[in-house]
């Protein structure tokens, strides 16, 4: 039986691979919008992510949290966005020879699992909105993530930009709490 990972149908009405988003703030707003719509549609946790070609702003991968919808603890927004991008580009790495630099924008700082996926994905930049403590304040367990975790990414050539539009992402967490969204790993 094949393993199939799918995004909710509503994602196509928000964004699609190939669209261009020029500015970092707008790229992050897309990741945050994916998180917000995931909450509004009751299709998962309050997390969204997108992979972009750095210099063109072309979307190459989209992701939302699908842990509950797909019954898998592995299906976090960052992992989905990275898998979508790699699948579309036909490469296990986004740093293959001849490929442009790719950036991962995430509505929240990655958990331990997603940090590992980011490290091995081939992205050259990680941009986050909400901070680890924001997710933990909501009740999520982010696992063993330390300052050294991010220093390791930097040593591997991945630029890390934290807390871009943090308050906008925190508003999605507030919406999730308001709606009684489940904390599935706390």
Language-model region placement:
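Zinc-dependent deaminase
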Residues: 1-38, 117, 121-186
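Short, solvent-exposed cationic patches
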Residues: 76-94
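Short cysteine clusters
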Residues: 111-114
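Short beta-strand scaffold segments in enzyme catalytic cores
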Residues: 47-53, 57
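Short loop/turn motifs at secondary-structure junctions and domain boundaries
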Residues: 40-44
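A short, polar/charged loop-to-alpha-helix boundary motif
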Residues: 66-80
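Immediate flanking context of iron-sulfur cluster ligation sites
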Residues: 95-108
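A structural microfeature
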Residues: 60-61
